[in-house]
From Swiss-Prot:
Gene Ontology MF terms: ATP binding; DNA binding; lysine-tRNA ligase activity; magnesium ion binding; phosphatidylglycerol lysyltransferase activity; tRNA binding
Residue positions binding Mg(2+) 2: 1091
Name assigned to this protein: Lysylphosphatidylglycerol biosynthesis bifunctional protein LysX
The keyword Transferase is annotated on this UniProt entry: yes
Record-annotated DNA-binding residue ranges: 726-804
Topology in the lipid bilayer: Multi-pass membrane protein
Family (UniProt): In the N-terminal section; belongs to the LPG synthetase family.
Record's miscellaneous remark: There are two lysyl-tRNA ligases in M.bovis.
E.C. no: 6.1.1.6, 2.3.2.3
Stored Pfam families: LPG_synthase_C, tRNA-synt_2, tRNA-synt_2_TM, tRNA_anti-codon
One GO cellular component term: cytosol
Principal cellular location given in the protein's record: membrane
Length: 1172
C-alpha cells in the first residue's frame, strides 16, 4: 500500500542556511512507501533486518508504527456511521454514473425506479442530487450530527409517505409490495439511526443551517436564470411557456417532476449543464452545512501564561516546547492543568505542534482531551514534530507514527573547531574573521527598544517571502517583551553594521533552540558558521549546555544512501531527495547541520489513518506557511477570546492576562492537590501523619525546629545518679498509654531507655498531649530527672518535652523489623534506626578503619591521597569504569588501584606511605564483591614481602581487637537440632602466628602430585583436566597455576594463611624471587575462602618493568579488558630509581567481613543495589 505524504519543511527558518544566495526557502516533499514488512515492534523498526540489509535501507530511514489501541469503536453501534455513509455513497455513485452514461442509466433503470419510488430519492440524470448525496455520505462517515439529522428526516418523511399510500389503498399487488417493503426498511433505518445517535458526535459551525439555506437560495436563483437563458437560446422541441419551469425543475427540483409533464425536450447536453448549476448551488450549501467547526487558532493571555508556567516546571527536556507559545495556535489542557497540547485547524485537520507541554505523567490525559476535541468537531488528528517519547504517547492513544527526520543538537561542552572533521567549519570561520566580522550575543531583555525595532526591520527585509513561515519549530514573532529570555546573536562588520542574526528561544534554563536565521546579501561566506561557532564556544559563560539547530528532513536517507555498499533502494531514495532538493533544500539543510557534528535526535509525524495522510500533509504545508490560502489570517495579530485553561487552574488567580509566566511556586502548590490521577498518592498511615503535621503547624508548633545539644546521651543518662537532671534526645520506638501515665521507649545511638510521662510531674500539658502529637518514629527531646518506675526499671521522669522531628512514615514492624535483605540495603537509614545489629556493624567498621590507621601511624607511615580519576587504568588487572571529561574531551577511568601513583611518591623519597580510600572495579556483585570498595595500599622502603607478613597480621589482629574487644573473628555457623535450623555467629581465635605456604606446595597437596615452577604447560593442562579445572588455550604455565590455585587452594582455605611465591607471569609489578627461578616475591592472605590482601617485593628495575607492562598493553590491545595499559609517565618516574620497597594491598571491606562474620553488603553502609 503506497502512502503519498507531503511534508512541510519542519525547521526554524531555513532561509539562514549558508548557500550561494543570501536567502533560501523551505519546502519538503516526499513520497514514502509503506511495505508489508513494517511492524509495530517499536518506533525504531521499519523493515525486517534481512530485507533492510539486502536493499541497503536502515531502520532509521523511514519509520512507520501501528497504534496499540484505537480511540473509537467501543460502542455496539460504532458501525452505524460507516454503514449509512457507504449506503448513501453507493447511491450517489450510481446516480452520478447514470447522469453521464446512458448505458448505465439503461442498465440500472428498473432497480433505480424501485428505489426511487419506495426506498430513497434516486432521480434520473441529476448531478445536483448526486453531489448532495456524496457530501451527505462523507458527512455521515465523518459522524456529523447534522448529517444524521438530515438522513433521519428523509427516512421519517419517506416512511410517512409510504404509510399514507398503504392507508389509501387501491394499489396493485406490485405497488403494495413495494410500499410495504419500503415502509419496513424505513422503520428499521429509523430505529438504527436513533440507536446510533451517540455515534454522530461531530459538530458543525453555529448557524450552519441558515447559512446553507442562504447559499443554496443564491446559487439556485443564479442557476435558474442561467439555465432559462440557455433554453431560450437552444430550446430544442421544448414549448416556450414551459422553458422556465423545465429549467427550475432541472436545477432545483432534482428532476422530481416527470419529464412527460413537459411538451418536448431540449438537447440532452443541456440537461447535464442544468444539473451542474444545481449541483454547484447544492454543493456550496452542503459544504456550508456540513463544514466542521473552525478553531480560532489564537491563544488568550491566560492560555499563554499557563503554558509558560508548564514550561518553567516541566519544559527542560523539549527543545521545541517554547514554540508552544506561538500565538496563532489554540490549546487544549488536561483536566488537571498539568499538561496541554497546542494545535491549529487547517482543512479539517487538527494539527498538534510537537509534544504535549507539561508533566510527562499527564501527557496521556492531554492527548485524550485533544482527541476528544477532534472527535467533537469531526477533525482529523495529526501531529508534526513529536519526539520519540511524545510519539510513543500518541501511539499509545491510537495514532500511527512516521519518522520525518532529525533535529540537530549541539553540546557546547563537546564542541571544538579542531580536528579533521571540523575542517570545513574552521575554514569558513577563518574567512569570516578575515573579513573583519565579530559576533555579539545578548538576551532580548538587554536590547533597547529602538535597537530592537531596527532588528525587526532587518529581519523582515532579509526575508524572501511575503509571510513569516513556521509552525511547530518557529515562534512567529520578534521583539515581544514576553520573550525577554530569548537570545540574539549578531554578526557585525568593521563598520559596526549588522550583517546576519540568529534568534534563539529558551530550552529549559540551560539550553536554546534556533528560531530565526537571517543574513544580508552583503554578508561574506562563513558568516553563519562564525555565529554558530562563537555561540557554542562561549556557551558556558551564558549558562548554555545545549543548542538546538535546524531540522533535517529524511536525514538518515541522505546519510545511508551515500554510504559505501548502500543498496539500490537506498541509493534511489537518496537520488530522489537530491533531485527535489533543487527546490526544497532538503540536502542543503542536512549538510548545513551535519558540518557541526551534532547529535541527531529523531522527530516524528503522527496520524490516525493512512487515508488522512494527504490531508495532514496539506494542513502542515498551510500551517508552516508554504501554501497561503485566500482570505488567510496568517499575518494578522492573533488574540484569543475564550481561555482554554481548566477552571480549577484559572480560579487560583496565578495566571496573568498579559501572557507572562505565573509564580512557579504557586503552581507547585496547586499541582500537589489538583492532580488528575498524577498527584502524589500516599498510603493511609502516611496521610494520617501528614494531617497531624498540618494540625501541629496550624497550632503554631514547629515540627522541625532548630536543634540544641542534649546534656546526656541515653547511655550517660542511664549511668547518671538518681534524681540527676538530664535532657536526652532520641527516636520514639514504643509507646504504652495508661491514661494519666504514659511510658515510651527512647533510642539514640548510644542505647535505649524508658521515659515516663506523668500528668502530675509535667510542668505543662498532660500525657495525652504527647500521645496526640507524636507517633512511633518521631524525634523528641526529653527533659527531667532520673528515677525508676514502680517495677524498678530505670526511667527518665519527664517534666518537659519538645518535638524535634516529625516522622511522616511508619517504622517497620517492631517485632520483625526489616526482613528483606534488598529492603535493608535500599533503606539503610531505616535499618539503622530499628536494627541494633546494623548499628553495631557501622561501629565495628569505624573501629577497624581507625585501628588500621593508628597501627600504621604508630610505625611512622604517612597517609596520602592520590587521584581517583586516572587517564590510564593500571596498578592491577581488572575491568575499569570509564567516564568522560568534557573540558579536555577525553575518557577517564575510575581507579582500580592507587599503586602506580604511590610508587611515584616512593621514587620521590616518601619511604613509608599508605592510602586508605575507594577503588572501583567493573566486575561482579556477590557475597564478597562490590564494584566500589575500600582499599588499603601501603609501601615501606628497604623492605620486602616477608616483612609485610607480620605487618599485615598485626593490622588485622589490631582491627579485630578494636571491633570485638579481642583478636577474634566471627564465623557464621548453622546448627541443626530437634527445634530446627539455627543460624548464629561463632568466635574464632585469630591471635598468634598464621601459617605460611608456597603456592606450588599447596597445589601439590591438593592434586596429590608434585608440581613446581619448572612443571611444563602440557603437564599442567593434564592436571587441570584430571581435576576438572577450566583453562584457556592461550594461557601460559603461570596463568594455569594461578587457576589451579584459585580452584583448589584458595576456595578451600579455612584459617588465615599466607600463600607465597606466585608465578612471575601473573605478577607484572612484582620483582622476581631472589633465589627461586620462575616465581615472584608475592604472597596472598586467604581466610575462609576469601582473599584478604596481597603483598609484593616491588619490581624496581625500570627496564624489566617496561617489558612486562608492554606485554600487558599487548593483551589490552588484543581485547583483554582487564589488562593494564602502558603508563609512560610511571615508567619515566621509575627510571629515576625507586628504593627496594615492599608493598601491601588489603581489602578493608573483606577484613570487616572477617571480623564481623557478615557479607560485604551488610558491612557497607550503602552497597550498590539493583535498580527497581
Amino acid at each position: 500500500m503506497g502512502l503519498h505524504l507531503t511534508v512541510p519543511g519542519l525547521r526554524r527558518d531555513g532561509r539562514g542556511v549558508q548557500s550561494n544566495s543570501h536567502d533560501t526557502s523551505s519546502k519538503t516533499t516526499a513520497d514514502i512507501s509503506r511495505c508489508p514488512q513494517h511492524t509495530d515492534a517499536g518506533l525504531q523498526r521499519a523493515a525486517t533486518p534481512g530485507i533492510s540489509r539486502l536493499l541497503g535501507i536502515s531502520s532509521r530511514s523511514v519509520t512507520l508504527t501501528k497504534p496499540r489501541s484505537a480511540t473509537r469503536g467501543n460502542s455496539r453501534y460504532h458501525w452505524v456511521p460507516a454503514a449509512a455513509g457507504w449506503t448513501v455513497g453507493v447511491i450517489a455513485t450510481l446516480s452520478l454514473l447514470a447522469s453521464v452514461s446512458p448505458l448505465i442509466r439503461w442498465i440500472i433503470k428498473v432497480p433505480r425506479e424501485f428505489i426511487n419510488d419506495y426506498l430513497f430519492n434516486f432521480p434520473d440524470t441529476n448531478f445536483a442530487w448526486s453531489f448532495v448525496l456524496a457530501l451527505l455520505a462523507a458527512a455521515l462517515t465523518a459522524r456529523k450530527r447534522i448529517a444524521w439529522l438530515v438522513l433521519l428526516a428523509n427516512m421519517v418523511l419517506a416512511a410517512v409517505v409510504n404509510a399514507a399510500e398503504i392507508a389509501a389503498g387501491g394499489n396493485t399487488a406490485a405497488e403494495s409490495f413495494g410500499e410495504n417493503l419500503g415502509f419496513a426498511v424505513h422503520v428499521v433505518a429509523i430505529v438504527v439511526l436513533v440507536l446510533g445517535y451517540r455515534e454522530f458526535w461531530a459538530k458543525v459551525r453555529r448557524g450552519a443551517l441558515f447559512r446553507a439555506a442562504a447559499v443554496w437560495l443564491a446559487g439556485a436563483v443564479v442557476g435558474i436564470v442561467a439555465s432559462w437563458g440557455l433554453v431560450e437560446l437552444f430550446p430544442g422541441s421544448l414549448a416556450p411557456d414551459e422553458r422556465l419551469g423545465y429549467a427550475a425543475n432541472r436545477v432545483v427540483g432534482f428532476a422530481l417532476a416527470d419529464p412527460d409533464l413537459f411538451t418536448g425536450r431540449p438537447h440532452v447536453f443541456l440537461n447535464a449543464i442544468f444539473g451542474l448549476f444545481g449541483a454547484f448551488a447544492l454543493i456550496g450549501a452542503a459544504i456550508v452545512l456540513f463544514l466542521s467547526q473552525r478553531a480560532d487558532n489564537a491563544l488568550t493571555g491566560e492560555d499563554e501564561s499557563a503554558i509558560r508556567g508548564l514550561l518553567d516546571l516541566y519544559g527542560k527536556d523539549d527543545s521545541l516546547g517554547y514554540f508552544a507559545t506561538r500565538r496563532d495556535k489554540s490549546v487544549v489542557f488536561a483536566s488537571s492543568g498539568r499538561a496541554c497540547i497546542t494545535y491549529r485547524v487547517e482543512v479539517g485537520v487538527c494539527l498538534a505542534s510537537g509534544d504535549p507541554v507539561g508533566d510527562h505523567r499527564a501527557w496521556p490525559q492531554a492527548v485524550d482531551a485533544w482527541l476528544r476535541l477532534c472527535q467533537t468537531y469531526g477533525w482529523a488528528p495529526g501531529v508534526m514534530g513529536a519526539s520519540s517519547q511524545g510519539a510513543q504517547t500518541y501511539r499509545e492513544a491510537g495514532l500511527t507514527a512516521l519518522e520525518l527526520g532529525d533535529e540537530a543538537i549541539l553540546r557546547p561542552a563537546d564542541f571544538k573547531l579542531s580536528g579533521p572533521e571540523m575542517r570545513g567549519v574552521r575554514q569558513a570561520v577563518t574567512r569570516a574573521r578575515r573579513a573583519g566580522l565579530t559576533v555579539r550575543i545578548r538576551r532580548h531583555r538587554d536590547i533597547a527598544e529602538d535597537e530592537m525595532a531596527q532588528t525587526i526591520t532587518r529581519a523582515d527585509s532579509w526575508r524572501d517571502t511575503e509571510t513569516e513561515r513556521g509552525f511547530s519549530m518557529a515562534l512567529g514573532r520578534l521583539g515581544d517583551p514576553a520573550d525577554s529570555d530569548c537570545l540574539l546573536v549578531e554578526a557585525i562588520d568593521p563598520h559596526n553594521q549588522v550583517l546576519a542574526m540568529l534568534s534563539l528561544v529558551p530550552w529549559g534554563t540551560t539550553g536554546v533552540s534556533l528560531d530565526l536565521m537571517r543574513r544580508s546579501p552583503q554578508s561574506p561566506n562563513g558568516t553563519i558558521e562564525l555565529m554558530v561557532s562563537e555561540l557554542a564556544l562561549h556557551a558556558e559563560s551564558l549558562g548554555i549546555t545545549r543548542i538546538s539547530l535546524n531540522f533535517a528532513v529524511f536525514r538518515a536517507a541522505f546519510e545511508q544512501g551515500a554510504q559505501l555498499g548502500a543498496g539500490p533502494v537506498a541509493r534511489l531514495w537518496r537520488g530522489l531527495l537530491v533531485f527535489f532538493s533543487r527546490w526544497w533544500q532538503l540536502e542543503t539543510l542536512y549538510r548545513s547541520n551535519m558540518k557541526y557534528q551534532p547529535e541527531w535526535v529523531p522527530r516524528y509525524a503522527c496520524y490516525e489513518d493512512a487515508r488522512v495522510i494527504p490531508r495532514v500533509g496539506v494542513a502542515s504545508v498551510i500551517a508552516e506557511g508554504f501554501l497561503v490560502l485566500p482570505f488567510s489570517r496568517r499575518n494578522r495579530v492573533h488574540t484569543g477570546h475564550h481561555p482554554a485553561v481548566p477552571e480549577r487552574l484559572a480560579a487560583t488567580g496565578l495566571l496573568h492576562h498579559d501572557g507572562s509566566a505565573p509564580d512557579v511556586s504557586g503552581l507547585r502548590q496547586v499541582g500537589l492537590t489538583n492532580g488528575d490521577g498524577v498527584e502524589r498518592r500516599l498510603p493511609e498511615q502516611v496521610r494520617v501523619r501528614f494531617d497531624k503535621l498540618e494540625k501541629l503547624r496550624s497550632s503554631g508548633i514547629d515540627a522541625f525546629p532548630v536543634g540544641r545539644p542534649p546534656s546526656h546521651t541515653v547511655a550517660q543518662a542511664l549511668a547518671a545518679d538518681h534524681q540527676a537532671s538530664v535532657s536526652v534526645s532520641g527516636r520514639i520506638m514504643r509507646i504504652r498509654n495508661y491514661g494519666g501515665v504514659l511510658f515510651a521507649q527512647l533510642r539514640d545511638w548510644s542505647g535505649e531507655m524508658q521515659v515516663l510521662l506523668d500528668n502530675s510531674r509535667l510542668d505543662q500539658g498532660c500525657a495525652a498531649d504527647f500521645n496526640a502529637a507524636t507517633d512511633l518514629g518521631d524525634l523528641v527531646e526529653m527533659t527531667g530527672h532520673m528515677g525508676a518506675s514502680k517495677t524498678g526499671t530505670p526511667s527518665l521522669i519527664v517534666s518537659g518535652w519538645r518535638l524535634i522531628g516529625k516522622c511522616l512514615r511508619p517504622l517497620p514492624n517492631k517485632w520483625k523489623g526489616l526482613l528483606d535483605p534488598e529492603a535493608r540495603v535500599r533503606t539503610r537509614y531505616l535499618d539503622l534506626a530499628v536494627n541494633a545489629e546494623s548499628r553495631a556493624l557501622i561501629t565495628a567498621r569505624s573501629s577497624v578503619l581507625r585501628a588500621v590507621r593508628e597501627t600504621l601511624f604508630a610505625k611512622g607511615f604517612v597517609e596520602v591521597e592520590t587521584p581517583i580519576l586516572q587517564q590510564l587504568h593500571g596498578g592491577a588487572t581488572a575491568r575499569p569504569f570509564v567516564t568522560h571529561i568534557n573540558t579536555y574531551s577525553m575518557d577517564l577511568f575510575l581507579r582500580i588501584a592507587p599503586e602506580l601513583y604511590l610508587k611515584r611518591l616512593c621514587v620521590g623519597g616518601v619511604e613509608r606511605v599508605f592510602e586508605l580510600g575507594r577503588a572501583f572495579r567493573n566486575e561482579g556483585v556477590d557475597f564478597s564483591h562490590n564494584p566500589e570498595f575500600t582499599l588499603l595500599e601501603a609501601y615501606q622502603a628497604h623492605a620486602g614481602y616477608l616483612e609485610w607478613i607480620d605487618g599485615c597480621r598485626e593490622l588485622i589482629q589490631n582491627a579485630a581487637q578494636a571491633a570485638n574487644g579481642a583478636p577474634i573473628a566471627m564465623r557464621p555457623r548453622t546448627d541443626k537440632g530437634s527445634d530446627g535450623t539455627r543460624h548464629h555467629l561463632e568466635p574464632v581465635d585469630i591471635s598468634g602466628i598464621w601459617p605460611v605456604r608456597t603456592v606450588h606446595d599447596a597445589i601439590s597437596e591438593a592434586l596429590g602430585e608434585r608440581i613446581d615452577a619448572d612443571t611444563g604447560l602440557t603437564t599442567l593442562r593434564k592436571l587441570c583436566d584430571a581435576a576438572g579445572v577450566p583453562y584457556r588455550t592461550q594461557w601460559d604455565a603461570g596463568a594455569v597455576v594461578l587457576e589451579l590455585y584459585e580452584h583448589l587452594v584458595e576456595c578451600r582455605t579455612e584459617q588465615p594463611t599466607f600463600y607465597i611465591d606466585f608465578p612471575t607471569s601473573v605478577s607484572p609489578l612484582t620483582r622476581p624471587h631472589r633465589s627461586k627461578r620462575g616465581v615472584a616475591e608475592r604472597w596472598d592472605l586467604v581466610a575462609w575462602g576469601i582473599e584478604l590482601g596481597t603483598a609484593y617485593s616491588e619490581l624496581t628495575d625500570p627496564v624489566e618493568q617496561r617489558r612486562r607492562l608492554q606485554e600487558q598493553s599487548l593483551l589490552a590491545a588484543g581485547g583483554d579488558p582487564e589488562a593494564m595499559e602502558l603508563d609512560e609517565d610511571f615508567l619515566q618516574a621509575m627510571e629515576y630509581a625507586m628504593p627496594p620497597t615492599g608493598g601491601l594491598g588489603m581489602g578493608i571491606d573483606r577484613v570487616v567481613m572477617l571480623i564481623t562474620g557478615r557479607s560485604i553488603r551488610e558491612t557497607l553502609p550503602f552497597p550498590l543495589a539493583k535498580p527497581h
